[in-house]
């Protein structure tokens, strides 16, 4: 009978979180290991469906996982580089869009539907959702000066038109979004998925932005999982970067959180997608999980 | 980390039940030990609030517990009997109503509000909710014939007017109902709480009627808790009564379930209110609890 | 035929008042003789129903009448005094609540229902309607200093949560409210009914607050009913208190009106509940009745 | 004080009628003396506004009074007769329409607006309200046979399109209707106002049709007002016609009532428009007034 | 096949205009030749219906055409003049109102209905639409001073109550309005139709005000239609008046446009009603037509 | 000025069709030349946007054009055949889905958005829109018997879930649908686009199904465009097939129309997509275009 009591206890523990987030929007950047491993994939889907069922509005923004590279390989498309920066030429962009919006996106949708949720797959073209323009990276030229350089169809977000996402969410659907932006002439741009999630969270005035990653969160000592920093504030970031605690691939993720917070998002989280149901644990339990970045 | 995974598993296990009962009405007869013990009381309240939060419409019908007798004693009101049947005279009825509608009912309401739910306490007079008339019990007279006998202000339900309960439930409130009926002239009647819950469940076209009792459910061998009959059908009832498996105080409870099922209620449950969170376990877990009576 | 014409004239006279108050809220403090005498009781109920029918939203806040003392006597509960101030101990509060919320309140509800209206009986616990805290009266100690003194479960209003009352009123119900407040831990407090009515009128942004009393209104000469002051302004009050025209039990009633007016209530009225249909006459006729206090 | 009590009594007497007719539609044929005398006119307007204010939906269909003939005279238009039947030629019809829809109709509207109501004046052309076709009267020819004869722009109702009237009534307006019908080519037809009122009452599924006339109602002895038949059933009509009790101009009025009743109208009334506020007295008092014809 | 392509091209050309004006209000002053010639009349009606069908809200304000003078003549009513200004005495006003509101207005309504639209005819009395007061013209007295002079029932707009027009437009009707104003005592006033249209356009926050006239628009050289000024700004007006380009009857029309623009109307147009479908061409084609006056 | 009049005439000619189809659903199968030629593509998009603007609900179902084969070639995927029937293996299906749902679909969406419409691209997985199962073609085996044969991921429609399409259409979006079906386990199936359009039209209770093809319609003499059969009934079909007038690729198209008509669609059309704006001409002009098949 103890087991039963524990069950009940866990359900009751979720109560204040359900109450707190009821009717609120949570934007989830879905990527990394959790998109590859079947068991993890299913766990994420179940978590998202459960959130929807208890009255939260989850919005999923996904990356492309290894599938894009696989397809580029099969087509024999080789990447071209400018000063070490990969260039997304038109053929590559075509493949990126097809894989993201036509395969990965629709697979996630089908999985949600199969487990009892209602989902709609969108890209940035649908309803003018993600309006973008070409990004110019600053690249050192021969003279050593950093000049804006065309790296192809990689885009910066110009405007988010969140109406369609809101309407779908309000009518019981889970919007699943491929981070393809659309330019003025209808051309496609590849948008970084973290960035797209962050911008969308701002436009939707989301209460939470959750980035599913392949690390435990921010560790004070990268080799020691027990050194996890479970919560930090925007003001703490510069010092942590200085000290090298936030470094490498974690820098853009933290930057994305900071920008989202400054744009009005309530809380941001960098959590470990390799742990099954990390999303659920983050949202519905007392302890939370990973690193929370707050204003 | 195992602990976390288990937590998630239990939340995910609840998913199909949340989906199944979302927007549905569950009428709960709240009585017995679960109204006396503070810890049990709190557990029932938490269960009801959680049900409401995830989109179910719980409706609570409560008994009076030991408080009525306590107040009758303090007032020196002694019960009068006719052929062994207790008579509810006007003074007694006055006390019953005050204690039920003015004390027990409002205490439950205050408890729900305190733990974060929204509740409204009603009796059968509010919005004409429970319309009743005097019940005449068949009592053997001196000649041995069973004649209808006036046993005072004990009532039979004439009509349920469920509008108010529905409106409150739809607007986010948990209706808490004292089983006081109202007669044509505005007089009060004491209604059996199980009966009131069953009638209300029918009028609301509830999906579930749950009776919180002080037994494990229906036991094949009353001394052996492991002999619990976890599910039975209406058709099985006569034989079980014949065999004495259903006997004593369990007979009216089962009768109440049968009537509710025949009146259109989806499922009925006799569960053990002495077990903390038995309500939650019944609704949100795979195993269920107690005895389910089905059509 | 003259009779008929007069009838019509009276109905037509009501026309501008119906127009003026259509959709507006009128809070009525119901107490005194009008709660004791059966004919007066019925007249008040009819008046309230008529107001509702023509599109006004009446909200009734009632006192306890002599019933509380009757029950306290029957239970042999004797009042305890501190420096002449009656103390409401826990046993007394229990009785006050039961009688107010479980008996008087539900009787009024049953009467409205019986005469064709729709009513719901509430106390301050329902929907967190009247949130209160312990009141400390300033009492002279032995040294003659006035110190805050615990007089038991007598409360001051901390906050009114008017949502439930509005929702019920909008859906065609007449809310009937027992002035029991609820503390942070769910404990009950006895609230002065005039005060509760005044606070509720403010929270509901009521257009009218009407206090049914056992006097004609404010009389310049207490022995001469013809000296009725039919209208006065807040600014006139201090002088009238000075002169002794407003004195005794009239002081808190006028204070209640003044506070309500300062809190945004349109008009306040002190009228004679001993006169049948005084409420109706106040609202629907040219002459009004009793004393109106205006800003 | 007695006066006040009487006032209240009359208001309370209206209560069940307000309740009964709340949200119901009452079609009023407004004509005769009540359209000529200024005091009577004002009384009718007040009655209609009061009905609207208490939640009834009055719809006014008016006749033309003496104004049409006045204008025909001023224009020197002389009526042309066929076998004693007046013919409405095109010039006459033009005047009828202008006076009815452009003068009488708008005057009533302006009066309602001036006394605080909201009104919209319509004729049968607005929203296709009254669709009509030419009526052919059966007229004896030289040979004595009754043949259908063209009497000009007099019309029979082909179809009522009640949508516009309902929409206006639901939004708080009192529709005021001139009985001008519209033919397939947009041509105008003069429709008998009683007939138009009766047809409209059927199309609107009205609860009451009230014909304001210049007699007390149906009198058993035309010379004795005390011989008023206050209520009769459809089945009684043939005998009363036979006996001559219903005769002359009363025959088409009663026929109009009978047809309305058969078309689903709840009650029909022939009342005395010469009595001020007869409409109000009919609707809101116990005694009613005039003759009620029931199914 | 070329023909078909052209057809399609014209429909496609209308696309941006449909999009631009969808849900917007266009007030049309309907007068002059377009009210006399049957073919022009029909073309205007078709244009208005088409506008409604594609989601625009046209509101028609009409003049009286030659019909008023015709009726005045038939009645032998001769105009009385004060210093050259025609006086609208009570008899004249009666005729004006009957003809405008009872004949011209309802004919337009019938025509719209006949061609498949839904229309309601209103005058300024309906719903208190156009509230007016007597206008006093400044007239030179014998001493040569300009003194305010009573010229009878000619009115200035005091207030527009646009609620009824909006409600009808929202429910699919085309409001057709006779420019009769109503005074405080319910008396009628003749309002200049251009002025009424302009005031209504302001009160409705219309996007367009279109005046149908009997000229091509504003011509730089009145004898040369090719000298049409297709667009001008408020600031250009004084100079054009100075130069005599805007003169005579065009002055009040331009003044009406200027006032409407200053009152918040988006665009105003003076177009040639003698050209069939000029309204349609103005709204739905690239070239527009007539003279547009802009802020 | 003649030109202007013609313009107006064409707009007015569209009026009855706008009226007729306002609020109705038109399903368009978009394929063939109209998907390849840029000018035709743009014309179709403009037509669809215009339909939406005037209140019609167009729903676009598209084919894949030559793009699928292009991508298959680039990937070196060769088709495998069974008895002459092409087999869609898993790799091929993956490409079909990516190209249809990720490239062609989103390009159409982007085009609609760019020209001012609002569009959402869906495939059969979104909201469970097209539920399918594997199709088994009857193929002659060696013994000559026709046996059901697995031809890979080609599907038959099991169920259409039209909710999402309706919700989007009601909220102003043009749904653009790639004919990918989803199986019970979330697997993808290639569905014939004509069939998908026909099934969707039935599920949506569409008023029109329009198939854009690369022929003029059904020609009695295939070499003579003037022999176009502009309208035929279901009953005429068998004889026309017998005579060879309906033959080859036209047979499944006509079958699709017949099935749609039997499933409740109002009208079906086979029109020439090679003609610019054929869609517009079919819907908004008197002559229609291509062949209409009616019940």
Swiss-Prot record, chains A, B, C, D, E, F:
Keywords: Amino-acid biosynthesis, Arginine biosynthesis, ATP-binding, Cytoplasm, Kinase, Nucleotide-binding, Transferase. Belongs to the acetylglutamate kinase family. ArgB subfamily. The record marks 29, 253 as: Transition state stabilizer. It catalyses: N-acetyl-L-glutamate + ATP = N-acetyl-L-glutamyl 5-phosphate + ADP. This is Acetylglutamate kinase. It is an enzyme of class 2 (transferase). GO terms for molecular function: acetylglutamate kinase activity; ATP binding. One of its GO terms (cellular component) is cytoplasm. GO terms for biological process: arginine biosynthetic process via ornithine; L-arginine biosynthetic process. It comes from Heliobacterium modesticaldum (strain ATCC 51547 / Ice1). The keyword rRNA processing does not apply. It is found in: Cytoplasm. Pathway: Amino-acid biosynthesis; L-arginine biosynthesis; N(2)-acetyl-L-ornithine from L-glutamate: step 2/4. Its EC number is 2.7.2.8.
């Amino acid at each position: 009978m103890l087991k039963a009591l524990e069950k009940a206890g866990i359900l009751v523990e979720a109560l204040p979180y359900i109450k707190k987030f009821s009717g609120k929007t949570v934007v989830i950047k879905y990527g990394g290991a959790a998109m590859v491993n079947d068991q993890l994939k299913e766990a994420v889907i179940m978590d998202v469906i459960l959130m929807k069922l208890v009255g939260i509005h989850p919005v999923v923004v996904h990356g492309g996982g290894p599938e894009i590279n696989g397809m580029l390989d099969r087509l024999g498309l080789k990447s071209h580089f400018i000063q070490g920066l990969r260039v997304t030429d038109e053929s590559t962009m075509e493949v990126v869009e097809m894989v993201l919006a036509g395969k990965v996106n629709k697979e996630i949708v089908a999985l949600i539907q199969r487990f009892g949720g209602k989902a709609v797959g969108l890209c940035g073209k649908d309803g003018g959702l993600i309006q973008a323009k070409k990004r110019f990276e600053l690249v050192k030229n021969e003279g050593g000066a950093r000049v804006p350089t065309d790296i192809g169809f990689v885009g910066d977000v110009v405007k988010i038109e969140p109406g369609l996402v809101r309407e779908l969410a309000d009518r019981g659907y889970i919007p699943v979004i491929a981070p393809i932006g659309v330019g003025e002439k209808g051309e496609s741009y590849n948008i970084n998925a973290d960035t797209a999630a962050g911008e969308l969270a701002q436009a939707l005035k989301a209460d939470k932005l959750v980035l599913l990653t392949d690390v435990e969160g921010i560790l004070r000592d990268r080799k020691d999982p027990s050194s996890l920093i479970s919560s930090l504030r925007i003001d703490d970031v510069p010092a942590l970067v200085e000290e090298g605690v936030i470094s490498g691939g974690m820098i853009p993720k933290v930057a994305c959180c900071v920008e989202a917070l400054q744009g009005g998002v309530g809380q941001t989280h960098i959590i470990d997608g390799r742990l099954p149901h990390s999303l659920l644990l983050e949202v519905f339990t007392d302890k939370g999980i990973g690193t929370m970045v707050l204003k």
